[in-house]
Amino acid sequence: MTQVAKKILVTCALPYANGSIHLGHMLEHIQADVWVRYQRMRGHEVNFICADDAHGTPIMLKAQQLGITPEQMIGEMSQEHQTDFAGFNISYDNYHSTHSEENRQLSELIYSRLKENGFIKNRTISQLYDPEKGMFLPDRFVKGTCPKCKSPDQYGDNCEVCGATYSPTELIEPKSVVSGATPVMRDSEHFFFDLPSFSEMLQAWTRSGALQEQVANKMQEWFESGLQQWDISRDAPYFGFEIPNAPGKYFYVWLDAPIGYMGSFKNLCDKRGDSVSFDEYWKKDSTAELYHFIGKDIVYFHSLFWPAMLEGSNFRKPTNLFVHGYVTVNGAKMSKSRGTFIKASTWLNHFDADSLRYYYTAKLSSRIDDIDLNLEDFVQRVNADIVNKVVNLASRNAGFINKRFDGVLASELADPQLYKTFTDAAEVIGEAWESREFGKAVREIMALADLANRYVDEQAPWVVAKQESRDADLQAICSMGINLFRVLMTYLKPVLPKLTERAEAFLNTELTWDGIQQPLLGHKVNPFKALYNRIDMRQVEALVEASKEEVKAAAAPVTGPLADDPIQETITFDDFAKVDLRVALIENAEFVEGSDKLLRLTLDLGGEKRNVFSGIRSAYPDPQALIGRHTIMVANLAPRKMRFGISEGMVMAAGPGGKDIFLLSPDAGAKPGHQVK
């Protein structure tokens, strides 16, 4: 069947840059990759992109906890994510980050267009504020009972049980995830996207066939309950992009995250030196196709906010959203205690990528159903299908071809009608890949594999090989078996990239969709090497145990200075500039009568003397040893009246306290009065 080449842009949901990739993530990336590889086999121009979702308070707080900058943390996380995806042979054309200049420019562009078109509204809101941490609480840092379905322990922006979205202030009995404190209300000016203005457009888009039936039905419920304006701003401190002309206000992560699809593609176009393609794919009247593979937990954002943002800023909308369900393991939610919360990297330490790719693919359909990774069934299915049915078909015929015929296949097919049965299946299997009915495609392929093995069993080449004057029959039978193996591997090529590479090396030819119409006749194959190894439950047991150990290690208390004394909240440069640090010479140091903690220091600031009380006595039992040293002091600190006198500043020291206090000293050459910058 001849197809017209299409231009296709495919994305996966952006993994959040504060944690490792696990097997739940991998379902989506494998599903998308199989579909993309099939599209490429059919000759379409496919751009497959992704990025890390790298903004938000969770990243800011975790970086503080680790004692590193958010930029450093997301950089390290990006490398880990890309390594995991490469390990599973996810064939991205580009993997980027939402914390990029491309994404900043596009976010500001879309925001400015929405504002110019009247879709951004300003209003003062009452917002939850953590009195202990001194910060406004993002949606995901408030938990409570869902106001719609009354499910407990739900986040402040949407319910994972009923899918409803709401304001954090609507939560019943909210608690701060950061400190556990009960939040208080404070006013703050915020910016809102006028989503209700797009209700008519969204309802028409919903009915256009751009969504799975289950998603379209869910959207109808949201329309019936009424669309609300969407808060797209967050208050400092926040790690993200500051909103233009709005100091201290930042784009909410869910505004710039989907724009990250555009940012990653723009980055790819720039790398290629291809400035035309970006507009060709994203302009309002684009004929290119745009598909988002996402999980059912983020349907609301992708089916309402995202197309409305694109419409309001004069960009094209997605051709379709491909939504999948969750992953369970052994019939239950992934569990850290049971060792079934398995990271992608842990999996690759015990199994190859093709095995999981195959198992997920065999269970996937176009519906939004959850997928269960039953580890015992996984072992049985991989061995039964990949090893016993497919690889065994090659191994049981290749030996005779290599030993008896120097690797050369017969010049004619032994059973042309059987071969035609295999190639005629291309249309049904191709349609199944196209429509994401992956399980159906696998069932069709395995039915053919059974047919191929039945042919070999009936022809019994091992018997023919012992009979005189039947070399031609032996060559024909085994060549037929190898040709059928070639067709099967062509159909499985989108699923099993590494096994395909080994099969192509053995067959001495590239596997292409259209190529199967011509069998390999008189063709020389290479010596056969083992294509795939059986797996067993011992590997599963080791995998589960390794996952448990990783959880124990991660749960171990973090020790060290930063864990004991975390970094304080982020301040602005202007805040820091108010602190006047100066080099000071310690002219005198003495005990303070009546205090077992303080030393009285007389400091020379280069023309001005200061009297400072400092709680460093336990670390410096001989104060005379400090005389003549240079140190750093806060020179513009308001004088503080103490019962021992007036303290006119503060000297700088490091350490946990007690005897472990270390007075800071400038490098040689610094003089009293020099400002520390």
Swiss-Prot record:
Its cofactor is Zn(2+). SUPFAM superfamilies: Anticodon-binding domain of a subclass of class I aminoacyl-tRNA synthetases, Methionyl-tRNA synthetase (MetRS), Zn-domain, Nucleic acid-binding proteins, Nucleotidylyl transferase. A motif ('HIGH' region) lies at residues 15-25. Binds 1 zinc ion per subunit. It catalyses: tRNA(Met) + L-methionine + ATP = L-methionyl-tRNA(Met) + AMP + diphosphate. It is an enzyme of class 6 (ligase). Transmembrane segments: none annotated. One of its GO terms (biological process) is methionyl-tRNA aminoacylation. It is found in: Cytoplasm. A motif ('KMSKS' region) lies at residues 333-337. Its EC number is 6.1.1.10. Its main location: cytoplasm. Residues 575-677 form the tRNA-binding domain. ATP binds at residue 336. HAMAP family: Met_tRNA_synth_type1. Is required not only for elongation of protein synthesis but also for the initiation of all mRNA translation through initiator tRNA(fMet) aminoacylation. Homodimer. This is Methionine--tRNA ligase. It comes from Shigella boydii serotype 4 (strain Sb227). The gene is metG.
